[in-house]
Amino acid sequence: MSEATALSPAEFEQALRAKGAYYHIYHPYHVAMYEGRATREQIQGWVANRFYYQVNIPLKDAAILANCPDREIRREWIQRLLDHDGAPGEDGGIEAWLRLGQAVGLDPDQLRSQELVLPGVRFAVDAYVNFARRANWQEAASSSLTELFAPQIHQSRLDSWPQHYPWIDPAGYEYFRTRLGQARRDVEHGLAITLQHYTTYEGQQRMLEILQFKLDILWSMLDAMSMAYELNRPPYHSVTDQKVWHKGITL
């Protein structure tokens, strides 16, 4: 039996971009937010839970750096850490997200405590970080390619939220504006790594599965939020109205 023929770089890129059909911009929770149908609680819940993703992105990127022997790749990839953590004496994306939290009426200390993070969101994000630690650096780096679709989702918030949610302080939108440029830059680097590394049919199909894994993570996070904030079925809702779920276990 002959081996399947690898996709050309252009065909492979097209296959990667086609995965955008499953990006979480199409999740009903996101659709409700940018159509102006989300409640204050639903937006606050999204901001609070997404903060857990934000603070873990630098851990994911640090894992990629730790596993990468290529100095030139590390020199460029480290910018992602600085984008989120901030350079010495400068704020980064995490501080910008805390300001978004304040803009929607959340206390920064409550966000930092992560007490509002739903178990389903925590499990999804933790799975992503653990994947980055255990995978080879090329696979972990390529898993970030959901950034191919990120500028569209940031722009949709900037276009629709000020119109639909006048109660949100506009200063909170700084994160989305900043990420528009950063995401486009990151895509160029991540896509170059991916197209160069995956040159066999089997490798390309594996990469498409890895990208789907990342899409599954983002979609599953919103599924958990939908249960809690749209259907009013948070964890243990049938036995208690208290937030009894674990708030994170440090190993």
Curated annotation (Swiss-Prot):
Pfam families: TENA_THI-4 (PF03070). It is an enzyme of class 1 (oxidoreductase). Keywords: Oxidoreductase, PQQ biosynthesis. InterPro entries: Haem_Oase-like_multi-hlx, PqqC, PqqC-like, Thiaminase-2/PQQC. Its EC number is 1.3.3.11. One of its GO terms (biological process) is sulfur compound metabolic process. Pathway: Cofactor biosynthesis; pyrroloquinoline quinone biosynthesis. It catalyses: 6-(2-amino-2-carboxyethyl)-7,8-dioxo-1,2,3,4,7,8-hexahydroquinoline-2,4-dicarboxylate + 3 O2 = pyrroloquinoline quinone + 2 H2O2 + 2 H2O + H(+). Gene3D superfamilies: Heme oxygenase-like. One of its GO terms (molecular function) is pyrroloquinoline-quinone synthase activity. Transmembrane segments: none annotated. Belongs to the PqqC family. Ring cyclization and eight-electron oxidation of 3a-(2-amino-2-carboxyethyl)-4,5-dioxo-4,5,6,7,8,9-hexahydroquinoline-7,9-dicarboxylic-acid to PQQ. This is Pyrroloquinoline-quinone synthase. It comes from Pseudomonas savastanoi pv. phaseolicola (strain 1448A / Race 6) (Pseudomonas syringae pv. phaseolicola (strain 1448A / Race 6)).
